[in-house]
C-alpha cells in the first residue's frame, strides 16, 4: 500500500520543509502579488480544462489557483498522511466510492452547498455519508453494451437476443466445439456481474447501501441470477471465460477482432475502440430474462476538499463553481465524460452522441455503489461468488452463502459499530 510505504518518513519531516512545500495548504501561502492561493489537484489530462475555467474564479474571489498534477487515486491514498503534514492540495477529484471512507475518517471537509438543485438524489447520495455532504458530483459512470455495427444492424434489446447470437456460426469458438463468443461479459468480476444480481433482486447493503448488517447477495433473486450466469459459462462460453485474470483480455481481443458481436463494458473503453477504428455502437444493456433491467453500479467522481485546508470557504466555493451547469458541460466537452449536473447532462444528451446517451439511459437503472468503508470487504469477499458456481466447485446457493459469510466475517473483524 502506498500509505504504508510512506511510513513515518513524512511525519518526521521538519515543519520548516513542510512550510516551504510547493503544494502546502497548511501555511495559507500567498502568491507573489499577496493574493491567497488555492491548490487544485488533477491528473495531467485535466490540466488544460482547469486552466480554462480558473481565471473567472480567480477574478471573482481575488485568489490565485495553483494546479498540482497527480493521479487521482495516488492523491487520495496520500491524503491521510499529506494532509496532517501540510502537503495536501486544497481541493481534488475523488471517485465516489472513496468519498465515504475518507469522509468518515476525517480527511474530507464536510460542506453545506448553497445549491443542490442541479443534481438528483442519486448523485447527491454518492457524495453524502451519515447525513454529511463531502463533495460536489462531477461525472457519472456505469456499464453499458458495446456492439459491432459491422456484425449487427441494431443493438440487442433483450438477453434472448444475446442468446440467439450463440447460434450464429460467425461466432463459433474454433477451439471448443459448441462454444460461442457472440456475446461476452466478465461476470467473474463482481463489478461486472452485480447488475445481473441486482436485476434479479440482489443487493449489497440494505437501506440504500448504508446498512452493512443487511447483505442481499444470497437471497432468492441473487441466487437465480447466479444460476442464469452459470448457463452462459456452462452452455455458451469457452472455458477460459472462467479465468478472472485473463477473461478481460480475451473479451477485448474477441471484440476488436470481430469475433464477438456484443460485450458489456465501461465508457472508458470507448477510446480504445475508436483508436482501433472499430465500427462500434453503444447502447443500454439488454433486458434480463425476468423482464427486469440490468442494474449495474452507478459511479463516477466528484470534487472534494481536504479537511486540512486553511481556506475552507474558498475550497467550498471552488467545489460549487467547478460543478455548476456551465463548467460541468465544459468538462464534458473537453473529456466526453458524462456530467452529474442534470442541466449539463441534458445538454450533453442533446448532442446525440451514442456513447453519452447509452450511459445516461443505463444510469437510470444503475445503483449507486455503497460509499461506506465496509464496501471494501465486498469487493474481496464476492470476487469468487460467480466463479465458484460457474466452475462447479460449489452449488449456486453455497457459493452465494459462502461469499456473504466471508463479507460478514471481515466486516465484523475490521469495523466496530
Curated annotation (Swiss-Prot):
Question: What are this entry's molecular-function GO terms?
Answer: carbohydrate transmembrane transporter activity; maltose binding
Provide one Gene Ontology biological process annotation: maltose transport
Highest rank taxon of the organism: Bacteria
The record's induction entry says: Induced by maltose and repressed by glucose.
The entry's function note states: Part of the ABC transporter complex involved in maltodextrin import. Binds maltodextrin. Can also bind maltose with low affinity, but is not involved in its uptake.
Q: What else is known?
A: Maltodextrin can also be transported inside the cell after degradation to maltose by extracellular amylase AmyE, transported as maltose by MalP.
Family as reported in the entry's similarity comment: Belongs to the bacterial solute-binding protein 1 family.
Task: Please give the name of this protein.
Answer: Maltodextrin-binding protein MdxE
Identify the gene encoding this protein.
Answer: mdxE
Amino acid at each position: 500500500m502506498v500509505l504504508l510505504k510512506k511510513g513515518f518518513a513524512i511525519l518526521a519531516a521538519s515543519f520548516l520543509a513542510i512550510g516551504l512545500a510547493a503544494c502546502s495548504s497548511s501555511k495559507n501561502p500567498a502568491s507573489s502579488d499577496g493574493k491567497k492561493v488555492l491548490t487544485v489537484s488533477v491528473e495531467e489530462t485535466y490540466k488544460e480544462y482547469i486552466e480554462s475555467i480558473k481565471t473567472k474564479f480567480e477574478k471573482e474571489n481575488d485568489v490565485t489557483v495553483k494546479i498540482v498534477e497527480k493521479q487521482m487515486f495516488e492523491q487520495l491514498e496520500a491524503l491521510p498522511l499529506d494532509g496532517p503534514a501540510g502537503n495536501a492540495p486544497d481541493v481534488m477529484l475523488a471517485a465516489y466510492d472513496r468519498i465515504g471512507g475518507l469522509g468518515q475518517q476525517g480527511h474530507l471537509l464536510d460542506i453545506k452547498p448553497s445549491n443542490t438543485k442541479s443534481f438528483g438524489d442519486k448523485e447527491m447520495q454518492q457524495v453524502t455519508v451519515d447525513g454529511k455532504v463531502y463533495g460536489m458530483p462531477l461525472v457519472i459512470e456505469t456499464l453499458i453494451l458495446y456492439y459491432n455495427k459491422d456484425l449487427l444492424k441494431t443493438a440487442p434489446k433483450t438477453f434472448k437476443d444475446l442468446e440467439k447470437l450463440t447460434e450464429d456460426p460467425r461466432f463459433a469458438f474454433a477451439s471448443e466445439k459448441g462454444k460461442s463468443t457472440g456475446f461476452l461479459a466478465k461476470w467473474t468480476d463482481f463489478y461486472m456481474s452485480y447488475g445481473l444480481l441486482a436485476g434479479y433482486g440482489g443487493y449489497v447493503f440494505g437501506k440504500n447501501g448504508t446498512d452493512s448488517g443487511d447483505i442481499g447477495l444470497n437471497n432468492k433473486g441473487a441466487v437465480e441470477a447466479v444460476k442464469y450466469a452459470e448457463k452462459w459459462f456452462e452452455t455458451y462460453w469457452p472455458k477460459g471465460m472462467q479465468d478472472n485474470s485473463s477473461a478481460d483480455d480475451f473479451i477485448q481481443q474477441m471484440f476488436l477482432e470481430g469475433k464477438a458481436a456484443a460485450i458489456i463494458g465501461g465508457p472508458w473503453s470507448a477510446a480504445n475502440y475508436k483508436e482501433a477504428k472499430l465500427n462500434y455502437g453503444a447502447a443500454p444493456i439488454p433486458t434480463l430474462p425476468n423482464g427486469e433491467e440490468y442494474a449495474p453500479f452507478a459511479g463516477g467522481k466528484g470534487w472534494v476538499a481536504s479537511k486540512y485546508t486553511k481556506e475552507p470557504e474558498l475550497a467550498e466555493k471552488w467545489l460549487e463553481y467547478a460543478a455548476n451547469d456551465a463548467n460541468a458541460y465544459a468538462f464534458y466537452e473537453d473529456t466526453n465524460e458524462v456530467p452529474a449536473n442534470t442541466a449539463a447532462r441534458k445538454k450533453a444528451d442533446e448532442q446525440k452522441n451514442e456513447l453519452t446517451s447509452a450511459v445516461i439511459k443505463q444510469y437510470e437503472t444503475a445503483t449507486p455503489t455503497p460509499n461506506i468503508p465496509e464496501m471494501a470487504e465486498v469487493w474481496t469477499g464476492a470476487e469468487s461468488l460467480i466463479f465458484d458456481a460457474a466452475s462447479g466447485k460449489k452449488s449456486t446457493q453455497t457459493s452465494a452463502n459462502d461469499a456473504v459469510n466471508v463479507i460478514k466475517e471481515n466486516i465484523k473483524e475490521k469495523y466496530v459499530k
